[in-house]
Amino acid sequence: MKNTVVIFNAGIGALTLGFQNAGYEILKAYEPDRKVIEIYQENISQNVTACSLSSIDPATVPDSDVWAFDLTQSKAEEVFYSLTLVQRRRPPAILFVMKKQLWKGFIKEHIFQLQEYGYHITHKNIQSSEVTAFPLREEFAYIVSKRVNASDMIMPVQVHKE
């Protein structure tokens, strides 16, 4: 049986492709921007639900092993909405991907909230160029929250050599 994931703020499909390559089944993807959804559907032959994090009813999100939130283009209120969804449903594992600057605020304000929900948290800051073949200089925080020991989580590693 495959592991399953729900993708929030699916963008053009980068997280989806990453999870598919890791052997996960994508149960559902959400994306608020209709133009971006068109690109996503060109990249990945899967339907996307057009809605923002603030408009998702937690009861309608499928049960899955992982909830993955792409918050790389988000503001702080998107973090709030993602945590509201998590609080209502408490999935087994959560992945947050966000710009390094947003992570600094996230840890100060929300890390204890996740711990109160029973999550163990680990994170790593990763340069985009380390995990893609593109010469990008953006640094992102990958935050894994798991309701069991987080020490067995594997962080992304470089897959493309120059």
Language-model features and meaning:
Residues F8-I12:
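Class I SAM-dependent methyltransferase "Motif I" SAM/SAH-binding loop
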Residues Y30-R34, V97-M98:
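Conserved acidic E/D residue at the C-terminus of a beta-strand in Rossmann-like folds
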Residues I56-S64, L71-E162:
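Class I S-adenosyl-L-methionine
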